[in-house]
Swiss-Prot record:
Pathway membership: Cofactor biosynthesis; molybdopterin biosynthesis
Native source species: Drosophila simulans (Fruit fly)
Function of the molecule: Acts as a sulfur carrier required for molybdopterin biosynthesis. Component of the molybdopterin synthase complex that catalyzes the conversion of precursor Z into molybdopterin by mediating the incorporation of 2 sulfur atoms into precursor Z to generate a dithiolene group. In the complex, serves as sulfur donor by being thiocarboxylated (-COSH) at its C-terminus by MOCS3. After interaction with Mocs2B, the sulfur is then transferred to precursor Z to form molybdopterin.
Subunit structure: Heterotetramer; composed of 2 small (Mocs2A) and 2 large (Mocs2B) subunits.
Lineage: Eukaryota, Metazoa, Ecdysozoa, Arthropoda, Hexapoda
Name this polypeptide is given: Molybdopterin synthase sulfur carrier subunit
């Protein structure tokens, strides 16, 4: 992750399998104020050991789903990021 520019602290919430793998329901990370969703996902996967579910994760920024991994995300201090794996069940 390239952090040459300004960096902010973001709250990360983990759900279901991502919570189990990260071994915590929530954390904080420092991220650049502007980053692609792919770069962000790769950083979270590496930092929190989410490799086994990487290809199935959904990210949400301030309660809005990130639909395209090529999207650039603009973060402000204290923003919220949710890491959501697909839910299964019946």
């Amino acid at each position: 992750m390239n952090a040459d520019g300004p960096v902010v602290n973001v709250h990360v919430l983990f759900f279901a399998k991502s919570r189990e793998l990260a071994n915590t329901p929530r954390s904080t990370v420092d991220v650049p104020t502007e980053i692609t969703a792919t770069e962000l996902l790769d950083h979270l996967v590496s930092k929190f050991g989410l490799t086994s579910i990487r290809d199935n994760l959904i990210l949400a920024h301030n309660e809005s789903y990130i639909d395209n991994l090529s999207d650039r995300i603009l973060f402000k201090e204290g923003d919220e990021l949710a890491v959501i794996p697909p839910l299964s069940g019946g």
